[in-house]
């Protein structure tokens, strides 16, 4: 039986599933301030794909990154540039709140990819501010809520333990094939939410 604490977070996740929120995942050249998005996927709560594309970065993908996400420089050689991809993503973000697993990372990478690729270069300051606000104020961290629901406490951090997406998916019987590719990760997030929100068996 769920605790009262778990019931609250289950209700939050159930509300997401019944909303027009979308789920976003990005794959990147790395984690640093100079890194860029090389793949982005957006799906809705029915699992329908709204956007799913590789992105050609302005610099090569490091080999150690390819080992994680299996995205090679050859795969992105003919992919569209971020400046061509982002307007479609922004149109969706302006209309919908969006979830991601550690959403602050995806939000940061969207903004810094705009900076790295020159997307902001010819825009007036108020438009740049509007875009950044649309990204930064409309995201929801699905991982943080799941962490609270799962309830594994980290005594060292004095907080709930951070749950890895693939681990959470496997825990709930969600296929993890293709992990660290954007579409697979989006579908894992959706699958985890659906499994958490299944009615309890008496």
Task: State the predicted function of each range.
Residues 1-20:
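N-terminal accessory regions of nucleic-acid-interacting proteins
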Residues 3, 83-87, 187, 191:
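Short, contiguous clusters of charged residues that form electrostatic/catalytic patches at enzyme active sites
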Residues 8-11, 84-87, 125-126:
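A generic local structural motif
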Residues 14, 18-20, 33-39, 44-71, ...:
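Metal-dependent phosphoesterase core characteristic of DEDDh/y 3'-5' exonuclease domains
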Residues 21-25:
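Short, hydrophobic/glycine-enriched beta-strand segments
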Residues 26-34:
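Short acidic, Gly/Ser-rich segments with clustered Asp/Glu that frequently serve as metal-coordination loops
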Residues 68-87:
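Metal-dependent phosphoesterase signature
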